[in-house]
Amino acid sequence: MAEVLLFHHAMGLTKGIHTFADELRGGGHTVHVPDLFEGHSFTTIEDGMAYVKEIGFEEIMERGARVASELPREIVYAGFSLGVLAAQKLAQTREDARGALFFYSCVPTSMFGSPWPADLPVQIHGMDADPYFVDEGDIEAAHELVASANHAELFLYPGDQHYFADSSLSSYDAEATALLLQRVLEFLRQLDN
């Protein structure tokens, strides 16, 4: 079974993130869910991003790297939105990563100074009308990553919600999340083959 390091989004470590992690654990996987906000949580994306700007994006990624340094290198890095920054940087630059899962976000691989490891499997999930994912360049970065990697998939779901797989938020889409979880669990299962 896979070991997963899962980073939360800009609203913090919500109950919905824990629920998602529990779904992966139900598939037999080990899931680590660190709190990169050190106990802070927010009711809006804007408030969460204001906190991130206050402490700095680099600090968020560094907190993720510190957690990763205490875990095995052979791990799947996963992130929701803001958490994709730490997950993508670690997956792209740390040796022996097993895979990557990006939810609602993707950044250009050039941001981390190296190409995506061609044989590192990755899935990217987002809604096809999510203004954050579609209008802020994430979908283009996702298409570029998929084109450059040997084992990469981009899954688009109908809808305009950003945090659609967080069951504790009003943006939750149960149908899209069920399909996302099915795809993620299959991805993790295939890593063991």
Language-model features and meaning:
Residues W116-V122, A149-H151:
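Short, proline-enriched alpha-helix->beta-strand connector loops that line the catalytic pocket
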Residues P131-D138:
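Conserved alpha/beta-hydrolase "acid-adjacent" motif
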Residues G79-G83, A87:
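Gly/Ala-rich beta-loop-alpha elbow adjacent to hydrolase catalytic centers
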Residues L71-F80:
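Alpha/beta-hydrolase fold nucleophile elbow
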Residues H151-N193:
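C-terminal catalytic histidine-bearing segment of alpha/beta-hydrolase fold enzymes
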Residues I124-G126, Y157:
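Short beta-strand/loop motif that positions the catalytic acidic residue
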Residues D96-C106:
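A conserved short beta-strand
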Residues A2-P72, F164-A165:
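Serine-hydrolase catalytic machinery in alpha/beta-hydrolase-like enzymes
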